[in-house]
């Protein structure tokens, strides 16, 4: 993919896996990804920030549990507080208006995408499970250490174990990117994107979905993308609306302080 053709990706929630049937009767395993009200929150520009990018927000967060600085950040964009914020670098002509909502038809069936997420944690794992080692022999002098990794180095020279040596250790819970996954189907009304095969992470986790860096498979893609602007959406969120939603939490926090001040005045 050329730098000047780079579109924004989206952040989606992994709902789980299913299967769909092809015309020849074969079944295709698919992962269901949900675009939960993905909106543009802010822009990064080359003049101000040194690079061009879009900041996207997805999901709903309670205003009373959102820090005041972030409430102002969302109110400036006229969007409700978001649970997840992600940034995607884009070409200058691929910037999308702040407040716009990206839709599922941003991706086209048949195109290739890259999906990044946090893999499922497996805890401490041995070398056979973690790296696929074959282990040691079952007999002929091997005792207890059948599943060990064996020698970790050479002789007195170099006399050390090199960094990055494949050994037992913590497995999973790291960022993983699966490349060149095919988009099978999209549902604009439900905000659903079906991709072929498995993607990193557990059900309910967040993943980043973007055009494949190694090519989109020759499919014509909409530029700068498919979205609904603020004018096409419902009434935009203003700063007053966000602050009013957060007012009960601020009042609860202020009540103990007021009570403490009253007790001090009575004692005086």
Swiss-Prot record:
Methylated by PrmB. Residues 242-268 are annotated as: Disordered. Pfam families: Ribosomal_L3. One of its GO terms (molecular function) is structural constituent of ribosome. The keyword rRNA-binding applies. InterPro entries: Ribosomal_uL3 (IPR000597), Ribosomal_uL3_bac/org-type (IPR019927), Ribosomal_uL3_CS (IPR019926), Transl_B-barrel_sf (IPR009000). The keyword Ribonucleoprotein applies. It comes from the Bacteria. One of its GO terms (biological process) is translation. Residues 242-259 have a biased composition (Low complexity). PROSITE patterns: RIBOSOMAL_L3 (PS00474). GO terms for cellular component: cytosolic large ribosomal subunit. The modification N5-methylglutamine is found at residue 156. Coiled coil: none annotated. Keywords: Methylation, Ribonucleoprotein, Ribosomal protein, RNA-binding, rRNA-binding. One of the primary rRNA binding proteins, it binds directly near the 3'-end of the 23S rRNA, where it nucleates assembly of the 50S subunit. Belongs to the universal ribosomal protein uL3 family. HAMAP family: Ribosomal_uL3_B. Part of the 50S ribosomal subunit. Forms a cluster with proteins L14 and L19. This is Large ribosomal subunit protein uL3. It comes from Maricaulis maris (strain MCS10).
């Amino acid at each position: 993919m050329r730098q000047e053709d780079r579109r924004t990706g989206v952040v989606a929630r992994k709902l789980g896996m299913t299967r769909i049937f092809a015309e020849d009767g074969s079944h295709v395993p698919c992962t269901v990804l949900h675009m939960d009200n993905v909106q543009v929150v802010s822009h990064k520009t080359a003049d101000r920030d040194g690079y061009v990018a879009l900041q996207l927000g997805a999901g709903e967060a309670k205003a009373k549990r959102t820090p005041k600085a972030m409430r102002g950040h969302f109110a400036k964009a006229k969007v409700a507080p978001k649970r997840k914020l992600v940034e995607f670098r884009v070409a200058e002509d691929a910037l999308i208006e702040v407040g716009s909502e990206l839709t599922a038809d941003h991706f086209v069936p048949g195109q290739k995408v890259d999906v990044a997420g946090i893999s499922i944690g497996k805890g401490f794992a041995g070398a056979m499970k973690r790296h696929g080692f074959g282990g040691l022999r079952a007999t002929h002098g091997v005792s207890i250490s059948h599943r060990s990794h064996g020698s970790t180095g050479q002789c007195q020279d170099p006399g050390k174990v090199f960094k990055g040596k494949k050994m037992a250790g913590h497995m999973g819970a790291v960022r993983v990117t699966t490349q060149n996954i095919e988009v099978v189907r999209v549902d604009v009304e439900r905000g659903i994107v079906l991709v072929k095969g498995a993607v990193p992470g557990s059900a309910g986790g967040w993943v980043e979905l973007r055009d494949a860096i190694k090519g989109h498979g020759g499919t014509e893609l909409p530029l700068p993308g498919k979205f609904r602007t603020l004018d096409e959406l419902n009434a935009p969120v203003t700063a007053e609306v966000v602050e009013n939603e957060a007012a009960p939490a601020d009042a609860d926090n202020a009540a103990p302080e007021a009570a403490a001040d009253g007790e001090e005045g009575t004692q005086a």
